[in-house]
């Protein structure tokens, strides 16, 4: 199968896609590709509502978070109707970057070993005192 050339690709603007956010016309964006899932709504294993919540917008992050199977990814290709216009790609909200925090190595040692050790010692002493009263 030959690769589709750029001139054969149908481009849609975000404004066009946003209009297709109801059960009679359900479009969404995955990785800058536009999908018409109207006929698939009732067949979707996760339910119609899942798709309708994302209709008219970018569902890439949610699609990836669910962890769809290879079969689902192959099936999705049959619903591609075009691509998001290159001028609108920068308008999509980008996922927030993960905040990475660093912990001082002494603090990590303290919280991982000393506090649990002291807690265990206190529990052992309380148990011993309780048993000694009997």
UniProtKB/Swiss-Prot annotation:
Pfam families per record: Cyt-b5 (PF00173)
Gene Ontology, cellular component aspect: cytosol; endoplasmic reticulum membrane
Subcellular location(s) per record: Endoplasmic reticulum membrane; Microsome membrane
Record-listed N6-acetyllysine modification sites: 7, 10, 19
One MF term in the entry's GO annotations: metal ion binding
Family annotation (PANTHER family): CYTOCHROME B5
Lineage of producing organism: Eukaryota, Metazoa, Chordata, Craniata, Vertebrata
Keyword ATP-binding: no
Keywords: Acetylation, Electron transport, Endoplasmic reticulum, Heme, Iron, Membrane, Metal-binding, Microsome, Transmembrane, Transmembrane helix, Transport
Chain ranges passing through the membrane: 109-131
List of residues binding heme: 44, 68
Residues bearing PTM N-acetylalanine: 2
Gene designation per UniProt: CYB5A
Protein name as annotated: Cytochrome b5
Family per similarity comment: Belongs to the cytochrome b5 family.
Function text: Cytochrome b5 is a membrane-bound hemoprotein functioning as an electron carrier for several membrane-bound oxygenases.
PROSITE patterns with a match to the protein in the record: CYTOCHROME_B5_1, CYTOCHROME_B5_2
Statement: the UniProt record of this protein carries the keyword DNA damage: no
Membrane topology annotation: Single-pass membrane protein
């Amino acid at each position: 199968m030959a690769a589709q050339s750029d001139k054969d690709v149908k481009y849609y603007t975000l404004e066009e896609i946003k209009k297709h956010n109801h059960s009679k016309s359900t479009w969404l964006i995955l990785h800058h590709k536009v999908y018409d899932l109207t006929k698939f709504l009732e067949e979707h294993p996760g339910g119609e509502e899942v798709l309708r919540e994302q209709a008219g917008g970018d569902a890439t992050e949610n699609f990836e978070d669910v962890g769809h199977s290879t079969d689902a990814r192959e099936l999705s290709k049959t619903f591609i109707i075009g691509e998001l216009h290159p001028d609108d790609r920068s308008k999509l909200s980008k996922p927030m970057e993960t905040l990475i925090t660093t912990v001082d190595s002494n603090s990590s040692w303290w919280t991982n070993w000393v506090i649990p050790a002291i807690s265990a010692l206190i529990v052992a002493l309380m148990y011993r005192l309780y048993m000694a009263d009997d």
